[in-house]
């Protein structure tokens, strides 16, 4: 089993570190040619969703990644990755991959100074540390989307089919249970 980590921008190295600590092989997906390599699951890291969306299109990766996700490839998306998956972005007509039937509010927690760390219950895993950096949250979710966690009555973690999307950055904490649960769901 091998995980492909989108490595065009953002916190991809941190996800790779966690996978390495768990003994899970991974490859960086930097261009369209990398999408021809073998990988069983995908991580869409945090970063800047607008930049990531543009780079996916400019590098001819967009359609292939969208097709893989629509075809059931397991995906773990964090922060900007959640925005990439969302079908709707509040106050913005931009649609990126659009495979997750939710509406997100971008930068919901403000600028860098609005960033924070907390702990909350993530259904199926338990209480986990959550680091929010200019994070989005899910403002609306389709009834078939499984809400896994809320913070201050805001949806911050969802699952839809094989898509697992988080507002926060588990890769920035030393608790690897979220990545382990994701990897375990693939095998």
Language-model-detected regions and their locations in the chain:
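Residues that mark the start of a beta-strand
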Residues: 2-4, 96, 162
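Hydrophobic anchor at the start of a short beta-strand
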Residues: 26-27, 75, 163
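Redox-cofactor binding/interface segments in oxidoreductases and associated redox assembly factors
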Residues: 43-44, 77, 166
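N-terminal beta1-alpha1 cap of cysteine-dependent amidohydrolase-like domains
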Residues: 1-58, 63-68, 176-180, 184-187
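A secondary-structure boundary/capping signal
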Residues: 8, 78-80, 100, 134, ...
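Cysteine-nucleophile active-site neighborhood
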Residues: 49-120
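Amide-donor transfer/coupling interface in amidating biosynthetic enzymes
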Residues: 106-187
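A residue-level structural signature of the nucleotidyltransferase/glycosyltransferase Rossmann-like core
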Residues: 41, 53, 74-75, 97, ...
């Amino acid at each position: 089993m091998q995980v492909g980590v989108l490595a065009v921008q953002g916190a991809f190295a941190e996800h790779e570190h966690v996978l390495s600590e768990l003994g899970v092989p991974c490859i960086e997906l930097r261009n369209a040619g990398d999408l021809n390599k073998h990988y069983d699951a995908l991580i869409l890291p945090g970063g800047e969703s607008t930049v990531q969306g543009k780079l996916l299109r400019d590098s001819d990766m967009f359609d292939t990644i969208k097709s893989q996700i629509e075809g059931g490839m397991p995906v773990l998306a964090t922060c900007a990755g959640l925005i990439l998956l969302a079908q709707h972005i509040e106050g913005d007509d931009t649609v990126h991959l659009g495979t997750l039937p939710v509406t997100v509010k971008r930068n919901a927690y403000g600028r860098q100074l609005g960033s924070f760390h907390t702990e909350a219950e993530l259904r199926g895993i338990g209480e986990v540390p959550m680091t929010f950096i200019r994070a989005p949250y899910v403002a609306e979710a389709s009834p078939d989307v499984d809400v896994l966690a809320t913070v201050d009555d805001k949806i911050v973690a969802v699952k839809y089919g094989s898509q697992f999307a988080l507002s926060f950055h588990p890769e920035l904490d030393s608790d690897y249970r979220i990545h382990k649960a994701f990897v375990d769901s693939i095998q």
